[in-house]
């Protein structure tokens, strides 16, 4: 086998942002047939070898029978999670000549694979889409859910990939996929049946007035009083009277939730501002991470 090199564009999550990672696959090297993974992979990334092997064979494709080196370039950056399964599998297919695609550089690709070859959800779809747009990539390939988050980013084609087989047929031109459209238009329907309501507060005229002024002007507010006087009860009801986030704020909120793996239901849960109530004894590290 002549040595062949394939490069697939992917990403790594760094906090709530994504940074570029190149998945380089080199097959046909002389030596004992085995797979070597380099580029600071963590345990989940190292295990991708076994997942990719099963996913390829269950998709009717084959692993190379030569020594193969996979490098996750951006080598000083720690790679975490199973998001490189799909780019590694596609890199192996390109390097072994099982997939011919002459416009691979147009795409940013990430996704976890199950043993059957189906894709599984990943964190940080929105951050990866923002990165793909910054890198001037034409399109991004992501598993379901992550793809729906990514569709919120304008100026980028987002394709939802459900299996390795579908990805190979799409990239080789045998299959046409329709890019996802942004779910922003559906932003009006949100059911708030169980939200605490500011109208539930009985009495407390002075506190209510202070809260309304703070919310209207975007000010900080401290409530001091004995236990049971209603501080927490009032605080829980403040999000209900805050204005809905602007589109930019909405994307910022979503980026944080996406990086934490807290996916949105159908795309638009955050028409109300998220409220967090850390305990007053919390340490700095617990609060800020």
Protein language model regions, located:
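Peripheral, non-AAA+ core regions of ATP-driven protein-machinery
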Residues: 1-236
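Conserved protein kinase catalytic domain
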Residues: 93, 168, 239, 251-255, ...
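Short, exposed beta-strand "edge-strand" segments with a Pro/Gly-rich flavor and a Y/T-containing core
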Residues: 155-162, 238-245, 276-282
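Switch/coupling sub-region of P-loop NTPases
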Residues: 196-209, 218-220, 249, 255-289
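Walker A/P-loop
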Residues: 222-264
């Amino acid at each position: 086998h002549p040595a062949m090199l394939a490069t697939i564009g992917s990403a790594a999550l760094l906090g709530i942002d994504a940074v570029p990672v190149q998945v380089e696959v080199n097959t046909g090297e002389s030596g004992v047939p085995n797979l070597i993974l380099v580029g600071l992979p963590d345990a989940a990334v190292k295990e991708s070898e076994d997942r990719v092997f099963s996913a390829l064979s269950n998709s009717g494709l084959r692993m190379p029978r030569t020594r193969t080196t996979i490098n996750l370039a951006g080598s000083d950056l720690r790679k975490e999670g199973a998001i490189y399964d799909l780019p590694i599998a596609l890199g192996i297919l390109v390097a072994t000549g099982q997939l011919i695609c002459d416009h691979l550089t147009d795409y940013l690709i990430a996704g976890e694979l199950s043993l059957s070859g189906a894709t599984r959800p990943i964190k940080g779809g929105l951050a990866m889409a923002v990165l793909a747009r910054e890198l001037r990539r034409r399109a991004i390939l992501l598993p379901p859910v992550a793809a729906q988050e990514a569709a919120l980013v304008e100026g980028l084609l987002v394709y939802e990939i459900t299996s390795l087989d579908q990805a190979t047929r799409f990239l080789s031109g045998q299959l046409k996929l329709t890019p996802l459209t942004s779910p922003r238009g559906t932003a009006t329907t949100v059911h708030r049946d169980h939200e605490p309501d500011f109208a539930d507060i009985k009495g407390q005229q002075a506190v209510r007035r202070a809260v309304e002024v703070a919310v209207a002007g975007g000010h900080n507010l401290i409530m001091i009083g004995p236990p049971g006087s209603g501080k927490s009860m009032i605080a829980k009801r403040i999000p209900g009277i805050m204005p809905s986030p602007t589109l930019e704020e909405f994307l910022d909120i979503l980026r944080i939730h996406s990086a934490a793996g807290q996916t949105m239901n159908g795309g638009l849960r955050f028409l109300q501002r998220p409220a967090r109530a850390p305990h007053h004894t919390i340490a700095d590290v617990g609060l800020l991470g």
